[in-house]
Amino acid sequence: MILELDCGNSFIKWRVIHVADAVIEGGGIVDSDQALVAEVAALASVRLTGCRIVSVRSEEETDALCALIAQAFAVQARVAHPVREMAGVRNGYDDYQRLGMDRWLAALGAFHLAKGACLVIDLGTAAKADFVSADGEHLGGYICPGMPLMRSQLRTHTRRIRYDDASAERALNSLSPGRSTVEAVERGCVLMLQGFAYTQLEQARVLWGEEFTVFLTGGDAPLVREALPQARVVPDLVFVGLAMACPLD
């Protein structure tokens, strides 16, 4: 079995899959390396034969995680690294090594699934969008604060905005104008996300008309799902690209 890891800015998304058919044995989201090891170790009858990682962490943090995995499960982790071109997709950055690996792998996965022009909208800690043309040219993209960052900034820099996570969840039952601070903040942030997504969709239409596929991924993708009914929701899109970048037998 293979352990796949997507190490983001705030959390680690993980899953264990069977080598032969990629059937998922288990998975989850954790907030620390130690929690990751504990959750994977708790899976019954799992014997890992490999591990592959995509990380936007520092090199030192990623190396430390690889060492921990080697110690806990006796496997050497393969870490995805930036390249100028792979699987028919050409990196669109002037300095290709500066493109975040999560964005690069999501673009690879999307192009592989779409077999043509595609727009990737990834809504996590940051909201990201990337455009890939029908001939595999990565045309660049956009990054702005995602829901967690918008919420955090308002809570941190506005003294009278204070509420708990349960209140935030209840506030999202509707997007009508808020009648409390928590409703106003949470719904306003969702509308910001939806506006970001709409703008990317219009950009794609200018480029390609209607001849493209939209992919939604990331933990907050459900918040814009109704606004983009034509989009394909692929929660593990980065893992699709990771398997292409780091094949394991």
Swiss-Prot record:
- Its domain of life reads Bacteria
Question: CDD domains attached here?
Answer: ASKHA_NBD_PanK-III (cd24015)
**Subcellular location(s) of the protein:** Cytoplasm
- Give the primary localization class: cytoplasm
InterPro entries tied to this protein: ATPase_NBD, Type_III_PanK
What are the BP-aspect GO terms?
coenzyme A biosynthetic process
- Identify the keywords attached in UniProt to this record, alphabetized: ATP-binding, Coenzyme A biosynthesis, Cytoplasm, Kinase, Metal-binding, Nucleotide-binding, Potassium, Transferase
Q: Does the keyword Ribosomal protein apply?
A: no
Positions with a binding annotation for substrate? Y93, G100, M101, D102, R103, T181
**EC number(s) on file:** 2.7.1.33
Q: Which residues form the active site?
A: D102
What Gene Ontology molecular function terms does this protein carry?
ATP binding; metal ion binding; pantothenate kinase activity
What is the UniProt remark on how the cofactor binds and its stoichiometry?
A: A monovalent cation. Ammonium or potassium.
Q: Which residues bind ATP?
A: D6, C7, G8, N9, S10, F11, I12, K13, T125
Pathway(s) per entry: Cofactor biosynthesis; coenzyme A biosynthesis; CoA from (R)-pantothenate: step 1/5
* Matching Gene3D superfamilies: 3.30.420.40
Q: Any idea which positions bind K(+)?
A: D122
The record lists the catalysed reaction(s) as: (R)-pantothenate + ATP = (R)-4'-phosphopantothenate + ADP + H(+)
Q: Name its co-factor(s).
A: NH4(+); K(+)
TM stretches of this protein: none
State what this protein does.
Catalyzes the phosphorylation of pantothenate (Pan), the first step in CoA biosynthesis.
Subunit organization: Homodimer.
Would you identify the family this protein belongs to, as annotated?
Belongs to the type III pantothenate kinase family.
Please give the name of this protein: Type III pantothenate kinase
Q: Which organism is it from?
A: Pseudomonas putida (strain ATCC 700007 / DSM 6899 / JCM 31910 / BCRC 17059 / LMG 24140 / F1)
Q: Which gene encodes it?
A: coaX
